[in-house]
C-alpha cells in the first residue's frame, strides 16, 4: 500500500505500480481552468485520478482501464478515498469508450503504457507483444479531439524522445502545446520524460521549462518538492 497525505493506493493486484511518472502527471496537469469534468485514460491503480480529485473541485472524474486486475484495484482505491462520489472507473478500452461518447471533458490526462527499450529481450515475439501493449499515441490524440470541451486541456507524460512525434500528431488534430516540462532524474542526467499540455487554442508563447527530480540520491530538488508536497508524506 502506498500512503499519500490524503489518500492511499493499494497496488497488490496489479503489475502497474505507483511510479514517479504518475505522480508527476497528477501534480503537474494544468487545472487553472477549473475543470468540471476529467478523464484519465489508462488509469492503472487510479493514482492520477485520485490526485486530481484532491487538487480540483471537478464533480465528474472518470477513469478508463482495460486490464481487469488494474480496473478492480482502481475501483477499490476510489471507493476507499474521500472522493468516492466524484470518481468512477470504466472497465473498457479507449476504442470502445469513444464509440459512443456521452460527455465532454475539460481535462483529459494519460500516462500511457509505452514500449521502453530497456525491456528488450532476445525473444522477438515477446518484444512484439510488449510493443503492441503500448497504447498508440494516435488513439489518445484522436480521443482527445473527440472528447475535449472547447477550452479543455490534454495532459500527458511520455518519453522525451517521443515528444516531437506526439506534438506533430496533436497538431494534425488541431491540438496545440501550451506547456512543456522536460524531466531529468538528476542535474547531470539526460532528459527522460516530457510533460505536455495541449489545447484547441494556439498560444503565441508556449511555456517551456525543465524539472530536475533529485540533486543526489533521495535528496529532492526544491522544485520537485514544491510540485509534490501536497501528496508525499515526507515532503
Curated annotation (Swiss-Prot):
Principal EC category: transferase
UniProt keyword annotations, A-Z: Cytoplasm, Methyltransferase, S-adenosyl-L-methionine, Transferase, tRNA processing
GO biological processes: methylation; tRNA processing
A GO term, aspect molecular function: nucleic acid binding
Compartments (UniProt record): Cytoplasm
EC assignment: 2.1.1.223
Gene Ontology cellular-component annotations: cytoplasm
InterPro entries noted in UniProt: DNA_methylase_N6_adenine_CS, SAM-dependent_MTases_sf, Small_mtfrase_dom, tRNA_Adenine-N(6)_MTase, tRNA_adenine-N6_MeTrfase
Reaction(s) the record says it catalyses: adenosine(37) in tRNA1(Val) + S-adenosyl-L-methionine = N(6)-methyladenosine(37) in tRNA1(Val) + S-adenosyl-L-homocysteine + H(+)
Function in brief: Specifically methylates the adenine in position 37 of tRNA(1)(Val) (anticodon cmo5UAC).
Recorded family membership: Belongs to the methyltransferase superfamily. tRNA (adenine-N(6)-)-methyltransferase family.
Name of the featured protein: tRNA1(Val) (adenine(37)-N6)-methyltransferase
Organism (species): Flavobacterium johnsoniae (strain ATCC 17061 / DSM 2064 / JCM 8514 / BCRC 14874 / CCUG 350202 / NBRC 14942 / NCIMB 11054 / UW101) (Cytophaga johnsonae)
Amino acid at each position: 500500500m502506498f500512503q499519500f497525505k490524503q489518500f492511499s493506493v493499494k497496488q497488490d493486484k496489479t503489475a502497474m505500480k505507483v511510479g514517479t511518472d504518475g505522480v508527476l502527471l497528477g501534480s503537474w496537469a494544468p487545472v487553472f481552468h477549473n475543470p468540471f469534468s476529467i478523464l484519465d485514460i489508462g488509469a492503472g491503480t487510479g493514482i492520477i485520478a485520485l490526485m486530481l480529485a484532491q487538487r480540483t473541485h471537478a464533480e465528474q472524474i472518470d477513469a478508463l482501464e482495460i486490464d481487469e486486475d488494474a480496473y478492480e484495484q482502481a475501483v477499490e482505491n476510489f471507493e476507499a478515498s474521500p472522493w468516492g462520489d466524484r470518481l468512477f472507473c470504466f472497465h473498457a478500452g479507449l476504442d470502445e469508450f469513444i464509440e459512443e461518447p456521452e460527455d465532454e471533458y475539460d481535462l483529459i490526462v494519460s500516462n500511457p503504457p509505452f514500449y521502453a527499450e530497456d525491456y528488450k529481450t532476445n525473444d522477438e515475439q515477446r518484444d512484439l507483444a510488449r510493443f503492441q501493449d503500448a497504447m498508440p499515441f494516435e488513439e489518445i490524440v484522436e480521443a482527445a479531439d473527440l472528447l475535449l470541451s472547447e477550452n479543455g486541456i490534454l495532459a500527458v507524460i511520455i518519453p522525451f524522445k517521443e515528444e516531437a512525434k506526439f506534438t506533430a500528431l496533436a497538431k494534425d488534430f488541431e491540438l496545440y502545446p501550451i506547456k512543456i516540462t522536460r524531466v531529468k532524474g538528476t542535474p547531470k542526467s539526460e532528459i527522460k520524460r516530457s510533460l505536455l499540455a495541449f489545447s484547441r487554442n494556439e498560444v503565441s508563447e508556449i511555456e517551456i521549462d525543465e524539472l530536475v527530480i533529485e540533486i543526489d540520491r533521495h535528496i529532492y530538488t526544491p522544485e520537485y518538492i514544491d510540485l509534490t508536497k501536497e501528496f508525499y508524506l515526507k515532503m
